[in-house]
Every structure is written in C-alpha cells, then in structure tokens.
Amino acid sequence: FVMTLDAVGPVPPISESHVEMDGAWALYETWVKFQMGLIDTALVYSYGKPSPGSLQDVLSTQLDPYYVAPLWPDAHAIAALQARHLLEKEEISFEDLADCAIRAGTIDSKEEYFDQPMFADPLRRADCPTYADGGVAMILAAEGKAEELCDRPAWITGIDHRIDSHHFGVRNLSAIPSAKKAALNAGLHQTDVDLAELHTSYTVQDILLRKELNLPLNPEKSSKNHPIKAETLMASGLLRI
C-alpha cells in the first residue's frame, strides 16, 4: 500500500487514509470527511490481485473461526448453500439463474447454460465469478470545487453504509436486510431508477438483491460489465460507482 501511494505521487505530502474492504467503503469514508468539512477534494482508489492464490478459499478465513472456517467451505460452496435454500423455498428457479447468467454475459443461451455440468451444486460455472486483477480510481470534490474541475459533475445525493452479520446462525439466507435499509436511507425508493449498478458475485446474489431493492429481474437493457464476468477483490464495488 505504501508503494501504491508512492505511485500516486502526492506532492507535497498530504493526508492519506487507508481502509480495508472494497473501495466503495473508502468512498463512504471520504464522503463523511466532506460532510465534516475536513477536505474539499479527494482521490479514492482501490485495487486487487487475486491471481496469485485461490481467492474463493482465502475468503473462507473470514468466517466464524470456531464452527465454520475449520470446515473450509469456499465462497462457491456458500453461494451454493444460499442458492439451494432459495430454490427449495421456490423463491427462485433454475430459469431465473439461467436468465441472470445470460444477462451477465457468462453464457450466451439457456441451452448452453443447462448443458453445463454442476460446478458447486446447484450452481453451474456460469453462475460463479471469474476472478480478475485490476484497479479503479475516482476523484471527489465539494460543491464549488467540483465546477472548477469539470463542466458537468455528478452529485452524490444519497448514500448509506450497512453490513449483515457473517454468522450463518443469526441471518436469513433468503433476505438482505442491510441492503434494504441502506436503499431506504439513501432515498432509492423516492424516485424512479434509470440505472442500477449492482455488485453481485453470483447469479443467485444478483437475483436476491434485485428482489430486495424492488428492481426488475430482467431489465430492458443490461450492461455486460458485470462483476460475475470479472470480479476484482476490493475494486469491483467502487468500479460499479
């Protein structure tokens, strides 16, 4: 991280704040500093390089250290547990998963989808992410300063930050209350949504998040820049923004 800061080249030396998690969390912390009047410009950046190791296994170390992590369920297996739960409750179908995979661009047709063998039952390879190395950066500026930097700044009019527990025993795998609460606090339901960028690593998560946010499962237009096609740890969330 120090080498990254050197590469950015802040001269003269300025305040730098290092946070963990996705770059979207760094953006939220930056927004808070703007509200406090501590800064009027900021560079927010994040990057990830999962290629040297097995990311789906590394993520298992974040689970409950006593009851879950020693069993080494990888990220694919946990997503599969969630998918099986939703399928058996008949809240989603294999057709929904296939449609989402086509929308994400991991597969071209339903026939091709159903021809794939199970990868992490009941998920197929097209349901799961392909990990990629990458980075993202964006510049934030306060009102008054932003107009000096560009002719047409995009404004943050609502923002909220929430998280669900990672303990399986205290959460419902068929709901995302943190997302619903964050959407409410950010004012999502106060107006029509023209464009929605979702950071979802699996088709089952994409479907569930759309339901929680009351977004259509099959929108008229869909971006092929989907994180399932290229999931970059710590950068994919900020990239959506």
Please report, for each region that a protein language model flagged, where it lies by residue.
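Flexible glycine-/small-residue-enriched beta->alpha junction loops
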Residues: 42-90
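Short, charged N-terminal helix-start/capping segments
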Residues: 63-77, 109-134
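N-terminal leader/propeptide and maturation segments of large enzyme subunits in energy/redox metabolism
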Residues: 73-113
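Short alpha-helical interface patches
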Residues: 104, 111-115, 143-149
